[in-house]
Amino acid sequence: MTSFQEVQLQTSNFAHVIFQNVAKSYLPNAHLECHYTLTPYIHPHSKDWVGIFKVGWSTARDYYTFLWSPMPEHYVEGSTVNCVLAFQGYYLPNDDGEFYQFCYVTHKGEIRGASTPFQFRAASPVEELLTMEDEGNSDMLVVTTKAGLLELKIEKTLKEKEELLKLIAVLEKETAQLREQVGRMERELSQEKGRCEQLQAEQKGLLEVSQSLRVENEEFMKRYSDATAKVQQLEEDIVSVTHKAIEKETDLDSLKDKLRKAQHEREQLECQLQTEKDEKELYKVHLKNTEIENTKLVSEIQTLKNLDGNKESMITHFKEEISKLQSCLADKENLYRALLLTTSNKEDTLFLKEQLRKAEEQVQATRQELIFLTKELSDAVNVRDKTMADLHTARLENERVKKQLADTLAELQLHAVKKDQEKTDTLEHELRREVEDLKLRLQMAADHYREKFKECQRLQKQINKLSDQAASTNSVFTKKMGSQQKVNDASINTDPAASTSASAVDVKPAASCAETGFDMSTKDHVCEMTKEIAEKIEKYNKCKQLLQDEKTKCNKYAEELAKMELKWKEQVKIAENVKLELAEVEDNYKVQLAEKEKEINGLASYLENLSREKELTKSLEDQKGRKLEGQSPQQVSRCLNTCSEQNGLLPPLSSAQPVLQYGNPYSAQETRDGADGAFYPDEIQRPPVRVPSWEDNVVCSQPARNLSRPDGLEDPEDSREDENVPIPPDPANQHLRSHGAGFCFDSSFDVHKKCPLCELMFPPNYDQTKFEEHVESHWKVCPMCSEQFPPDYDQQGFERHVQTHFDQNVLNFD
């Protein structure tokens, strides 16, 4: 039958969806629920729908109304699912007497299920009415509706059902309780029988044991009281020991932190000491270099002073000679006029001509000496310019060193402030951490103390309970023994056999049971207490041993800390001594810098005074030269002849050319060093004998740069190369040789300044320092010794010069 139904369901498409509980009629314009079941032969889709069709439909479009079939939740393919749809009343047809049916239509338009036909009819009052007898045993008939009758019946059945369910539950509980009571009674009966047999055998032994247990109980109570006192004492000792251990640990941690800080500070001080030593060596080297430069400047200034002194003496001498020559010229003019008037002898005239020629030659020699003096003066001005440039570089170097010193001091102060701030921060952080640790340890100790206190209270309660139980059992036992004695006396008079059996069954089991229970509980408690006391004694011994170990460790750490403190104090003393030495070095360096500044300022003022005096002497010489040019050579010769005849002051003229007393320090010649100013008179360019004319070209020799290294820093290879290289001729000397005329220096300074490198012209009143800075900007400067090199100097040679400072370990601080 089942196989036939399955085949029929598979073959019939209208049976894939089964509609449940379809009534014969429904009310129009009322809510309608449609219950249907999806069989495993259909796969639901979200576009499937259920429609109400008139019976006799032909296609799926002949529906009256429809609703979308919801997709079932948690649908498993191949399973049966129940679904419900609710049609609203205003979508349903009216009471038209037609038959309708539900149809399930898939999303493809296939009808896969149809219900039984039904109608939409309004309920008539006649059909709904029923007659029934009155429940009050009267002969009256009651007319009611079917719905009301059905509701009454349903209410009655539900009430009866509830009452029956309550009654069934009560009966089930009672039966279960009765069964449990029966089983319990049976078990108790069997247990009581066995217990009576055991207790009868154990009663005699327990009576004796009870006495011994009482004595033992008293002893154990004493022991327990002693043990509790010892436990309290041990707890107090443990708390004190833990506090001491915590204090020692905190002290040890603080000492370790201090030790680490001391080591860190020592390392920092060592690093600072090393850096300060390096700076000290640098300052020493720099001070040496500045002292060398200052000695050179002092020697140059001394030479300039000597030159100025000699030149001043020569200027005074020449002034005297010029005054004497002027007086001689005046006398000779007078004599010449008198001779012309008085004598006409030719011999006298020839003699006078000869004297006049000698006087002219002497005047020419004095003029040449004056020219060379002006040349030497110009050379001195050039030397002054060079010294001013060197002085400017020395000032710049001094300012740079001062700035570096101020920067280093500021950095040291900032570093010290940062170090102090870091120390305070770390100390504050460590103190906070120690406080938190101490709080945590105190909290743990308090918790441990609370636990121990609770445990002691619990043991005290157990002891009190045991003592109460012992007292109660003793009283019960005495009462039972008294009652048993009375029963035994009564049973002797009546029925000895029955009385003995009854007493054995009634009294002995109760007394023996109480005694055995109490004794077993007391034994167990005593064993537990002895175990706890032994454990606490072991803990106390362990804590004592740990405390001893901690004391030994603390002593060791204290000794190590004392040693480290001594070392730290020694390091602090060393650091303070080093700081004092550095402070002394800095003070000495500052004093030396102040002295050097004073010397430089004095030299600058002295050079300014020299330049002013030289300008005055040049202006005086110009005036005197102009006066001499205004007189005729005959008058000069007459004056010289008269002076020579009267005073005999004219020396005989030598045929040798005049020699400079102080050579030109900037002429092109081979010297030992470019800065020493040592010259040889045989190598100086001498002017020709002819009388110089003021119309000749004026040539000013430009001071040449010092291309040699400082003393002690020469490269032997470079010196050998320099010996083979030919010395370039001085352009000023070439100019003199090409003209073949005497050197003449125009003392007037109304000429434009010209840069010797880029040939840029500057006005006469242009600032000398700016002009020197412009000229120096073309030159290469050594970063170590501040030596200057021309712009066309070989780059490799310049690099070799810089490397020589490092090759000879000038800046080696080891």
Swiss-Prot record:
InterPro entries given in the database record: CALCOCO1-like, CALCOCO1/2_Zn_UBZ1, SKICH, UBA_autophagy_assoc_protein
ZnF UBZ1-type: positions: 752-778, 779-805
Positions of the UniProt region annotated as Disordered: 701-733
Modification comment: Phosphorylated in the C-terminal region by CHUK/IKKA leading to NF-kappa-B signaling down-regulation.
Binding site for Zn(2+) 2: 782, 785, 801, 805
Binding site for Zn(2+) 1: 755, 758, 774, 778
Region feature (Oligomerization): 320-420
Coiled-coil ranges per UniProt: 144-623
Modified-residue entries (Phosphoserine), positions: 124, 138, 225, 619, 632, 693
GO molecular function terms attached to this record: kinase binding; signaling adaptor activity; ubiquitin binding; zinc ion binding
Cellular component GO terms held in the UniProt record: autophagosome; cytoplasmic vesicle; mitochondrion; phagophore assembly site
Record keyword Ubl conjugation present: no
GO biological process, one term: negative regulation of canonical NF-kappaB signal transduction
Location (main, coarse): cytoplasm
Entry keyword set: Apoptosis, Coiled coil, Cytoplasm, Cytoplasmic vesicle, Metal-binding, Mitochondrion, Phosphoprotein, Repeat, Zinc, Zinc-finger
Domain of life: Eukaryota
Subcellular location: Cytoplasm; Mitochondrion; Preautophagosomal structure; Cytoplasmic vesicle, Autophagosome
Subunit relationships: Homooligomer. Interacts with TNFAIP3. Interacts with STARD13. Interacts with MYO6. Interacts with TOM1; the interaction is indirect and is mediated by MYO6, which acts as a bridge between TOM1 and TAX1BP1. Interacts with MAVS; this interaction induces MAVS polyubiquitination. Interacts with TNIP1. Interacts with TRAF6; this interaction mediates deubiquitination of TRAF6 and inhibition of NF-kappa-B activation. Interacts with RIPK1; this interaction negatively regulates RIPK1 ubiquitination. Interacts with NBR1. Interacts with TBK1. Interacts with RB1CC1. Interacts with SQSTM1.
Domain notes: The C-terminal UBZ-type zinc fingers function as ubiquitin-binding domains.
Role according to the record: Ubiquitin-binding adapter that participates in inflammatory, antiviral and innate immune processes as well as selective autophagy regulation. Plays a key role in the negative regulation of NF-kappa-B and IRF3 signalings by acting as an adapter for the ubiquitin-editing enzyme A20/TNFAIP3 to bind and inactivate its substrates. Disrupts the interactions between the E3 ubiquitin ligase TRAF3 and TBK1/IKBKE to attenuate 'Lys63'-linked polyubiquitination of TBK1 and thereby IFN-beta production.
Name under which the protein is recorded: Tax1-binding protein 1 homolog
Gene: Tax1bp1
